[in-house]
Amino acid sequence: MKNLKEDFPIFAAKAKENEPFIYLDSAATTQKPQQVIDAVANFYTSSYATVNRAIYSSSRNVTEAYAAVREKVRKWVSAASDSEIVFTRGTTAGLNLLAISVNDLWIPKGGVVLVSEAEHHANVLSWEIACRRRGSLVKKIRVHDSGLIDLDDLEKLLNEGAQFVSIPHVSNVTGCVQPLQQVAELVHRYDAYLAVDGAQGAPHLPIDVQLWDVDFYVFSSHKIYGPTGIGVLYGKKDLLDQLPPVEGGGDMVAIYDHQNPEYLPAPMKFEAGTPNIAGVLGLGAALDYLDGLSAKFIYDKEIALTTYLHKELLEIPGVEILGPSIEEPRGALIGMTIDGAHPLDLGFLLDLRGIAVRTGHQCAQPAMERWNVGHVLRVSLGIYNDEDDIDQFILVLQDSLDKIRR
């Protein structure tokens, strides 16, 4: 089988400089394949124009290419219509858009939004800030040691009157995969709405928002091999039509009236101003690349590698893996602590040998509190990784532990 590293120029560039480079931080951001880099460069060098605003040919051509990406995203998440796809600046921006708009429309003063007790900051601070301004409340759903939502606690909080639930698809700390279809059924039984932070789900798992019946799903381009500064908010069409816009500007209003403006329908009413055209085109190129591999191939490869990594780590004394057991569903990442070794020290020693991992609280201090740890060493995989990367990581990790424990 082809070595997928060949599609990502950074690996050849590092090799040319004789610089070791094993990238195990794809949960933070992914490396970019050549066709994504080419798509962005070609837009700026040979086809640059604005979109949705002009009748000249170069603008029409770019507008057509831009619209085609919305359809590619629709297919990637299995949405019913491309009008359910809103382009944002990323997962964080999408969650903040939702938090503000949802509070404006559906959450009364004193109302309740639910998040889990182990969230990334993007899916807790966004809601806390918006709810504080609204006068509504954020309450926390308990999670089990595996990281799974406690469905009994969720039902208790829904029964008490919560109006909205926002949870991660895959934890960026533990890799735990939430049973979205089961959660959605429970949430809708109590006439509430469900949003999903899909930052760690969309790049690694087959996505089917219709099958799961989630109301909203949010993710970032840069974690799915596309450019930074662009993201996606999926929302059911009837719900997006109800929600008010949170930003004003060009290309989102049909008729301006200073007392009662008539906004364009979704998704345009949520995309004020000149968009990140290069980012959207780069995202389209990333999805083309992934479609050439297939979501099933990506999932199968990454699950096999993650399981292999998990088994190897279990052989190292003192390693404590957070979240799911080796038999339970897990995304393409593992967070761990190691007795007698601080994650920051290990991260430094690994970097000296050309191995990139994430250390610290992972922008998820609530999760650190839930598992009673201060810092975590996280290994996260991408489609370019292979068993050789894992073998080298394990070798250097053991060597680093020997140095620290002397």
UniProtKB/Swiss-Prot annotation:
<dbReference type="GO" id="GO:0006534">
    <property type="term" value="P:cysteine metabolic process"/>
</dbReference>
<dbReference type="InterPro" id="IPR000192">
    <property type="entry name" value="Aminotrans_V_dom"/>
</dbReference>
<dbReference type="InterPro" id="IPR010970">
    <property type="entry name" value="Cys_dSase_SufS"/>
</dbReference>
<dbReference type="Pfam" id="PF00266">
    <property type="entry name" value="Aminotran_5"/>
</dbReference>
<dbReference type="InterPro" id="IPR020578">
    <property type="entry name" value="Aminotrans_V_PyrdxlP_BS"/>
</dbReference>
<dbReference type="GO" id="GO:0031071">
    <property type="term" value="F:cysteine desulfurase activity"/>
</dbReference>
<keyword id="KW-0663">Pyridoxal phosphate</keyword>
<feature type="modified residue" description="N6-(pyridoxal phosphate)lysine">
    <location>
        <position position="223"/>
    </location>
</feature>
<dbReference type="InterPro" id="IPR015422">
    <property type="entry name" value="PyrdxlP-dep_Trfase_small"/>
</dbReference>
<comment type="function">
    <text>Catalyzes the removal of elemental sulfur and selenium atoms from L-cysteine, L-cystine, L-selenocysteine, and L-selenocystine to produce L-alanine.</text>
</comment>
<dbReference type="InterPro" id="IPR016454">
    <property type="entry name" value="Cysteine_dSase"/>
</dbReference>
<comment type="similarity">
    <text>Belongs to the class-V pyridoxal-phosphate-dependent aminotransferase family. Csd subfamily.</text>
</comment>
<keyword id="KW-0808">Transferase</keyword>
<dbReference type="GO" id="GO:0030170">
    <property type="term" value="F:pyridoxal phosphate binding"/>
</dbReference>
<dbReference type="InterPro" id="IPR015424">
    <property type="entry name" value="PyrdxlP-dep_Trfase"/>
</dbReference>
<dbReference type="InterPro" id="IPR015421">
    <property type="entry name" value="PyrdxlP-dep_Trfase_major"/>
</dbReference>
<feature type="active site" description="Cysteine persulfide intermediate">
    <location>
        <position position="363"/>
    </location>
</feature>
<protein>
    <recommendedName>
        <fullName>Probable cysteine desulfurase</fullName>
        <ecNumber>2.8.1.7</ecNumber>
    </recommendedName>
</protein>
